[in-house]
Design a protein with these regions (language model features):
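C-terminal reverse transcriptase regions that engage the nucleic-acid substrate
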Residues: 2
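C-terminal catalytic lobe of pepsin-like aspartyl proteases
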Residues: 5-239, 250-254, 272
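Cleavable N-terminal signal peptides of Sec/SRP-targeted secreted and luminal proteins
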Residues: 244-251, 267
Length: 272
């Protein structure tokens, strides 16, 4: 979509023109569908942040730990020690979450120890099981801990998806991804980012998130200082300003199907 960190990205070009700050946010709703994408400084809700690793092509962050309902999961040495390239990437263009094989195995073992199930592979990719009870009540919460005490909680309805009635699969994947130096890489996609407002602040070199109802709205400030209410379906000015700046708003409509989020519709609004 052209919202990377490069100077040639859409966001960087808008910022260079003085239209907006280099800040954007998205909120993906995997419960009701839909969501929000906005360019501009987020006024509310308040979002805690963690530093971005500098001089990276991707949105790399420092993962400090993982726990399953408070029970720590051992991180691979190359992730825990943090190499120069940054071992964890935030990527909304990726559907699932990809972990080094040893971390993937440890995480699933912790989860299935708390809620025993008989796993079998589907499509040679997904670890699946039969289950008739409420998964949110039966399965544990996975917590990811990042630098500057930022936590991301991933709930069962986030990391599990249903192939059909009473058949569920884990969205966690054994990725086998590595940096050029051979160190392990964790790739966190929409599996963990959904149902959260995620803010990318390139001016301050941070990324952050807060749990949020992605079918509701957020408050965004444009380059002129005007504050707008950005809703999942429309854009309404909440301050009487005839701003000459630009505020972009994307309405996102998407669905989860067999472990894949599919973009169904994009609409954009621009205020000049």
């Amino acid at each position: 979509m052209g919202f990377g960190q490069a100077n040639t990205s859409i966001l960087s070009q808008l910022a260079a023109a003085g239209s907006v700050k280099r800040v954007f946010a998205h909120c993906l709703d995997n419960v009701n569908g839909g969501g929000i994408f906005a360019v501009g400084e987020v006024e509310s809700p308040v979002v805690k942040t963690t530093p971005l690793v500098p001089n990276q092509v991707h949105y790399n962050v420092i993962l400090k730990g993982i726990d399953v309902d408070g029970d720590p999961v051992d991180l691979p040495p190359s992730i825990a020690s943090f190499g120069g390239n940054g071992g964890t990437i935030i990527d909304s263009g990726t559907t699932l979450a990809y972990l080094p094989a040893n971390l993937y195995n440890s995480l699933l073992k912790k989860i299935t120890t708390r809620q025993p199930v008989k796993l079998h592979m589907v499509q040679e990719t997904f670890a699946c099981f039969s289950f008739t009870l409420n998964t949110d009540k039966a399965f544990p919460v996975v917590n990811l801990h990042f630098e500057d005490n930022l936590k991301m909680s991933v709930y069962p309805h986030d990391y599990l998806f249903s192939l059909r009635k009473d058949l569920y699969c884990f969205g966690w994947q054994s990725g086998g991804l590595t940096n050029q130096d051979g160190s392990d890489v964790i790739l966190l996609g929409d599996l963990v980012l959904s149902n959260k407002l995620v803010v990318y602040d390139l001016d301050n070199e941070v990324v952050g998130w807060a749990e949020h109802n992605c079918s509701s709205s957020i408050k965004v400030k444009d380059g002129s200082g005007a504050v707008f209410s950005v809703e999942a379906n429309n854009l309404i000015a909440s301050s009487s300003s005839s701003s000459s700046s630009l505020l972009l708003h994307f309405h996102i409509s998407w669905r989860r199907s067999r472990g894949k989020q599919t973009c169904k519709e994009w609409t954009t609004s621009a205020y000049l």
